[in-house]
């Protein structure tokens, strides 16, 4: 059965939602990998192990986000060719993307294996958890090659409007991850190493499933292993879009690493509390990433078909959906977030501190929505550098400046993390201003 979707015609809000929900659910299951690790490690291995796993999050995200950005570049290029019905270019883009996944996966795996300890030490991870954190991070990076392959493969499917198959694969892999987590950590007592190995196995299963699907597809995006190679003109286009998108994603991680360094100074208990908060906070970021991916694919296909009026209508619709989700999640998590917190830890101090963070930060979720939607819209049109620049200024530079010059005068955890809503408001304002100029230049609006 053909599960691809042509975004160049049809009811916009229905198309976006039908495409969005499988991505959102898939993101939930992907997040479940690390969440299950955290729950099992926290309950079975204690607070120190929980803090060790949590302290690696920003560094792993820094690297992972870059290859996710590259996969975004591949997805945009394929979506544009798909909208333009250019079969030869689709074929070249698919095989170039897979080669890029293999090469980038190898590079990132080697980086993680050789530099994990030094990087964690540099951001101030306490020495009582440094060795465990380094072990977890090295084992996690063993999965970079299958992780890159899965992200590229699912990006190819989403580019042609298929968001359901990546969801099915993630559900299967999440089950695999939970089973191996339980066996390795709870039964065999392998600690955080067991949790990392379970994630590696799950990522490998994902990569195999998506590759098999592409190989046996009868559509224009069929993958032939013997034809995997770089097509330089297509590679250049993918990198021109994907590299800035990857850098933009890493900007968030760089800023968060700087903040994590300041958070680490408050001790192991605060690190554990923040780690739990980040897991709950991920629900919002999954929703934003899903609607961002949906609008990027939608715009990519319509840009390839030169349907500029439809692009503008799609952006407005996506923004309305994003704002609705942001407000709804803020209300739900502020009222019931404490129940989720108790899944991760039974320590009353951690539960109370985490709930305090939820009430302090989550009401401001709505202020971020313009960043995700306008960035995705511009990227779908092939403009990736300017959104990266705006994020660099509004997120990275401003957060680093805040914790360097302002928060030392307010030496509390909230004095550090208040930089999040401040930068959300600022960056959204920058995107609103620039998007008005972007519309005039690209659509004549």
Pin down the residues of each PLM region.
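Juxtamembrane/transmembrane-helix interface segments of polytopic membrane transporters
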Residues: 30, 34, 38, 42, ...
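Helix-loop interface residues and adjacent transmembrane-helix termini in multi-pass membrane transporters
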Residues: 35, 44-47, 81-84, 159-160, ...
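Small-residue-rich hydrophobic transmembrane alpha-helices
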Residues: 50-110, 147-166, 273-337, 368-391
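Short alpha-helical transmembrane segments in multi-pass integral membrane proteins
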Residues: 1-20, 78-143, 187-243, 299-364, ...
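Transmembrane helix-bundle signature of multi-pass secondary active exporters and lipid flippases
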Residues: 23-76, 140-147, 236-302, 322-330, ...
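Short runs within selected transmembrane alpha-helices of multi-pass transporters and secretion channels
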Residues: 71, 140-158, 166-174, 195-210, ...
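Hydrophobic transmembrane alpha-helices of multi-pass small-molecule transporters
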Residues: 62-65, 177-182, 207-211, 283-286, ...
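Alpha-helical transmembrane segments of multipass membrane proteins
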Residues: 35-38, 110, 152-156, 178-183, ...
